[in-house]
């Protein structure tokens, strides 16, 4: 009988560097939400893939940046906390952008924690004027770290990365069933799907000023699911924008969210969205517990 092996790794880095895209690419499912806007991921998203005798557990994390408000600070703390749960730490680097102070701060903190990260130089499928300089800097200043040039979007060199990761796995019973892709509750995933559509369909800063909670999940006789969700905002004016003229905006968001849920869960969904105003919700620990940060 083949002995089971397990290994875990976390993916950290700046916002929009490709962390969520990489998780989705590796597990082969759209689990972690991805938008063109920064700071989309708010909590640790656990992905699972079982390759032959090895189970790989990976943690997508919020982007690391210079936080200002209470929510932003909680997100960054959440990202750093993931390091304690993983066997390997992957620092994903956007090769289309120059190194800045935040990147240097990340490297300094990793060094202070005695962590030798694996560098994932992402977006190499696009020509970059910074690529050679980044490689030279990392090679000279971090000779003990491995460097994998990859493209999370196209999948370039991902097989080689996975071969390295599985080669580091140790004999240990799997923590999850062979076909599991996450340990996140379906209610949480459904809320994330709606939050993604809010990012795509609302302008400017409004998506950062809200949260989504799944309040009801009911399996009906025909095996379809009735889902009630609440979009929580801090101002009445935000509620007006989300609702749109005659409710047109929230209907559009609801329709797109429902389609994504049906695609992910594999069963019909009846989705009902509501908007509630809770002033200063960002200061309420109840919401942070729900968001898992």
From Swiss-Prot:
Residue pairs linked by disulfide bridges in the UniProt entry: none
One GO CC term on file: plasma membrane
One annotated GO molecular function: ribosomal small subunit binding
Region (G3): 60-63
Domain Era-type G: 5-174
Domain of life: Bacteria
Domain KH type-2 positions: 202-279
Quaternary assembly: Monomer.
NCBIfam families: era, PRK00089.1, small_GTP
Reported function: An essential GTPase that binds both GDP and GTP, with rapid nucleotide exchange. Plays a role in 16S rRNA processing and 30S ribosomal subunit biogenesis and possibly also in cell cycle regulation and energy metabolism.
Membership in a protein family: Belongs to the TRAFAC class TrmE-Era-EngA-EngB-Septin-like GTPase superfamily. Era GTPase family.
Protein name as annotated: GTPase Era
Organism of this sequence: Rickettsia felis (strain ATCC VR-1525 / URRWXCal2) (Rickettsia azadi)
Lineage of source species: Bacteria, Pseudomonadati, Pseudomonadota, Alphaproteobacteria, Rickettsiales
Gene name of the record: era
């Amino acid at each position: 009988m083949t002995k089971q092996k397990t290994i875990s790794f976390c993916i950290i880095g700046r916002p929009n560097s490709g962390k969520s895209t990489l998780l989705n690419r590796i597990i082969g499912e759209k689990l972690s939400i991805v938008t063109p806007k920064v700071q989309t991921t708010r909590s640790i998203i656990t992905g699972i893939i079982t390759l032959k005798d090895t189970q790989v557990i990976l943690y997508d994390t919020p982007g690391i940046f210079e936080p200002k408000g209470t929510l932003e600070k909680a997100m960054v703390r959440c990202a750093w906390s993931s390091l304690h749960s993983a066997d390997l730490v992957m620092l994903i680097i956007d090769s289309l952008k120059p190194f800045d102070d935040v990147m240097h701060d990340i490297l300094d903190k990793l060094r202070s924690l005695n962590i030798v990260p694996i560098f994932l130089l992402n977006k190499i499928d696009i020509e970059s004027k910074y690529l050679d300089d980044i490689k030279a800097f990392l090679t000279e200043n971090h000779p003990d770290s491995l460097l994998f040039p990859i493209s999370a979007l196209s999948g370039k060199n991902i097989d080689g990365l996975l071969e390295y990761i599985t080669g580091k796995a140790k004999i240990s019973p799997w923590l999850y069933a062979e076909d599991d892709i996450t340990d996140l509750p379906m209610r949480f995933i459904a809320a994330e799907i709606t939050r993604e559509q809010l990012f795509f369909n609302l302008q400017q800063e409004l998506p950062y000023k809200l949260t989504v909670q799944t309040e009801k999940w009911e399996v009906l006789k025909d095996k379809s699911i009735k889902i009630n969700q609440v979009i929580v905002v801090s101002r009445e004016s935000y509620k007006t924008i989300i609702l749109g003229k005659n409710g047109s905006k929230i209907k559009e968001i609801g329709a797109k969210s429902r389609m994504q849920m049906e695609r992910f869960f594999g069963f019909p969904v009846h989705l009902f969205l509501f908007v509630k105003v809770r002033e200063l919700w960002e200061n309420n620990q109840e919401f942070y517990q729900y968001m898992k940060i």
